[in-house]
């Protein structure tokens, strides 16, 4: 995370950090998991990569929003939850649901949660998210899900950074 507290940074320093965050790659750890998975463990590797991708996105998203909006520790913790994310950003003039890929962030979070807590069973919220996922059945085709979600979450992260940068007059 940032070495200095957001309160001690000038607007120009915050803008510079946010612009440098546009170079962040969300899928580094996930791609490493996939590479190490080999052919035999392809689906298992992609399953674990989805969890790693979600973790990476959430960490970087929270870091960027906390920095840009000067959130306190309690707000930074709450920004991880969709309703609070919408509310906190709305107060600062950002319509989170209008940001490209906002639903992808929710889907990725639900997928990671289902993998971690539901033994990779498709939950009600994920039913038909992909044509091959049906509620109550085990998730399948993790490689296809990963490909779609990794591309979409990168777009969402960039769009979120663009909105945060615009708060500081950047483009």
Predicted regions and their residues:
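Amphipathic alpha-helical interface elements
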Residues: 1-132, 145-171
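Glycine-centered loop/turn motifs
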Residues: 135-139, 143
